[in-house]
Every structure is written in structure tokens, then in C-alpha cells.
């Protein structure tokens, strides 16, 4: 459980996540493989727009197949991390539009939110350059973050939502919503 996979087989794979694989991830992986001959193993040459959804999912390494069944890990310098502040919230009409909107936005800067959660997720004034969020503890059933933000903001977590999650800030339970 310490190694995360963004697209492998899992008996409990959620339908929405499978839709994300079909709509974005497969195409981004194909684009990556087509680009590799021109950049070698240096993904910093391609910028962060080639694989925005994979970056949003914090894909730190790509396992590139070689001959005779071998693979080589390739570092992704554009992975967004476990959590990050965004500058903008874009509201859409439904969950399908959340997935579609990811074709037009850069998840590093924009969170896409279903309008039915607009009262819970207020658009913030934008990320403060001094704000930080760091994953300090990772267990299968508990993630802990340390946040420092002088003016607050909207944070996106690179996690796949499962029913029953609970969130706490300074020991107090808080409401939160899943996002695209």
C-alpha cells in the first residue's frame, strides 16, 4: 500500500475514476510515449501541459517499458504534490462537466467544482506565495498535513475520494467536498 498506481487493476476501482482514466489518463500516457523519442528521459523539456491530469494525481514517476520486458522509471518534475493551493475555482453544472473541464484548465492553478457544492466551496482570493501545505504523515487510514497560510485559500488534495472520509483542522471536524 505504500506504492500508488494511477491506472492498474483494482477490484474496488470507482466508476468516476475509470471515467477519468478513459477521458484523460490514457490519452496523456499516449502523448507522453509519442514525445519520449524527442526528449529522452528529461520531461522538464516538455512543460506541464502534456500531462496535466497525471500531474494533478501526483504521478511522480512513469515506468517506461523497454525491450525484453524491462522497465525504467522516469521522474516527472511536473507532479503537483500531495496537496496544493489554487488561484481560482471554476464551477460547472455536474460531475460529467467536472471531468470535461479538465481539458481546458491547468489543475495547478484552477480547481473544478460541481455547482451543487458552490455554497461549501467558496472561491478564495487566490493562493498566497507564502502559503504552504506539506504531508507530514501517511498511513493507509490517515493522512496528516501541516498548513501555513496567512490568508487562507483553496487547497486541492491529490487523493481519490472514498465514502466515509472525515477531515479535521486543529482537532475540529470540518466539512469538505470531493472535487474534479
Predicted segment positions?
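Conserved hydrophobic/aromatic beta-strand scaffold that supports enzyme active sites
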Residues: 71-73
Amino acid at each position: 500500500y505504500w506504492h500508488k498506481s494511477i491506472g492498474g487493476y483494482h477490484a474496488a476501482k470507482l466508476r468516476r475514476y475509470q471515467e477519468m482514466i478513459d477521458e484523460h489518463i490514457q490519452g496523456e500516457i499516449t502523448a507522453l510515449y509519442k514525445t519520449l523519442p524527442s526528449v529522452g528521459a528529461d520531461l522538464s523539456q516538455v512543460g506541464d501541459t502534456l500531462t496535466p491530469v497525471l500531474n494533478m494525481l501526483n504521478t511522480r514517476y512513469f515506468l517506461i517499458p523497454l525491450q525484453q520486458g524491462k522497465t525504467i522509471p522516469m521522474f516527472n518534475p511536473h507532479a503537483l504534490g500531495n496537496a496544493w493551493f489554487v488561484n481560482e475555482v471554476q464551477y460547472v453544472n455536474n460531475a460529467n462537466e467536472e471531468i470535461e473541464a479538465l481539458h481546458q484548465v491547468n489543475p495547478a492553478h484552477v480547481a473544478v467544482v460541481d455547482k451543487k457544492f458552490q455554497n461549501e466551496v467558496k472561491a478564495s482570493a487566490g493562493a498566497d506565495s507564502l502559503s504552504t501545505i506539506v504531508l507530514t504523515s501517511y498511513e493507509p487510514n490517515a493522512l496528516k498535513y501541516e498548513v501555513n497560510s496567512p490568508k487562507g485559500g483553496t487547497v486541492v488534495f491529490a487523493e481519490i475520494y472514498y465514502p466515509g472520509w472525515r477531515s479535521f483542522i486543529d482537532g475540529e471536524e470540518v466539512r469538505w467536498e470531493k472535487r474534479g
